[in-house]
Amino acid sequence: MAWAMDNAILETILQRVRPLIGQGKVAAYIPALASVEGSKLGIAICTVDGQHYQAGDAHERFSIQSISKVLSLVVTMRHYPEEEIWQRVGKDPSGSPFNSLVQLEMEQGIPRNPFINAGALVVCDMLQGRLSAPRQRMLEVVRALCGVSDITYDATVARSEFEHSARNAAIAWLMKSFGNFHHDVPTVLQNYFHYCALKMSCMELARTFVFLANQGEAFHLDEPVVTPMQARQINALMATSGMYQNAGEFAWRVGLPAKSGVGGGIVAIVPHEMAIAVWSPELDPAGNSLAGIAALEQLTQTLGRSVY
């Protein structure tokens, strides 16, 4: 690789963006996330050949939230033919809030993409139809991808989200009214909230997602995770729809496929080179990590990396 990386570079980047802490807000609409310390800040890199770099709170676990939507899509791709998936969910950016009902009704219950709430719920509905134990299967997949056996769900976060699930339930019932949701709504919601409540660190996320930087293969696994074409498709979806309605702004500033979550995490992919994970719980108005985006911007400028 034509770049030099060490932990000191990442430490310097965190020092540059740390003054942003205090300018965002943690996700208060999920009570279990509202108590997270906003000053946390971490970054980690895993390269396609297995090198690891980290700085800050890179080994502290947090709720990955919507980052899990990429993982549920990966599992679905393993169990369904391509045409069946994309009949039920689209591939286009929404341009609307991630939990919007208005657009969903106008488009007759077909979500714009699998990374907004409606699309992720359809994906979870599909998994319910093919897996006897969807939550356990997700844990098995994530533990294998990461190479860490004790990754689990945060039961408190999952319960908190289920207790405040009116809007997501409305999304699911609306899709059911259009014939695009086939299983018991509360059961699928429980699976969805558990996926969001996966607890992982920046380093664990970087290892987990490195297969997307290497045409679907991970250095520590014997079998491909997805095909090269599927890896390209997932990266494309992340580039267009992974940062809620701010995908364009993120492409302008950072220039990498990425997926964020309201827990403050972001995973970004440099194709053929590395996966990057950042964490800072304070969010911008779109629900993306404020300092996390700034750290990724600093990193891509330092490395001279962009897919554009």
From Swiss-Prot:
Reaction it catalyzes? L-glutamine + H2O = L-glutamate + NH4(+)
Q: Would the keyword Hydrolase turn up in this protein's UniProt record?
A: yes
**Could you tell me which SUPFAM superfamilies the record lists for this protein?**
beta-lactamase/transpeptidase-like (SSF56601)
What does the UniProt keyword field contain?
Hydrolase
Its GO biological process annotations read: glutamate biosynthetic process; glutamine catabolic process
The Gene Ontology terms for molecular function here are: glutaminase activity
Q: Which InterPro entries does its entry note?
A: Beta-lactam/transpept-like (IPR012338), Glutaminase (IPR015868)
Q: Report residues binding substrate.
A: 66, 117, 161, 168, 192, 244, 262
**UniProt EC number:** 3.5.1.2
Q: Pfam families, per this entry?
A: Glutaminase (PF04960)
How it assembles, according to the record, is: Homotetramer.
**Family (UniProt):** Belongs to the glutaminase family.
Q: What is this protein called?
A: Glutaminase
Q: Which organism is it from?
A: Salmonella dublin (strain CT_02021853)
Q: What is the lineage of its organism?
A: Bacteria, Pseudomonadati, Pseudomonadota, Gammaproteobacteria, Enterobacterales
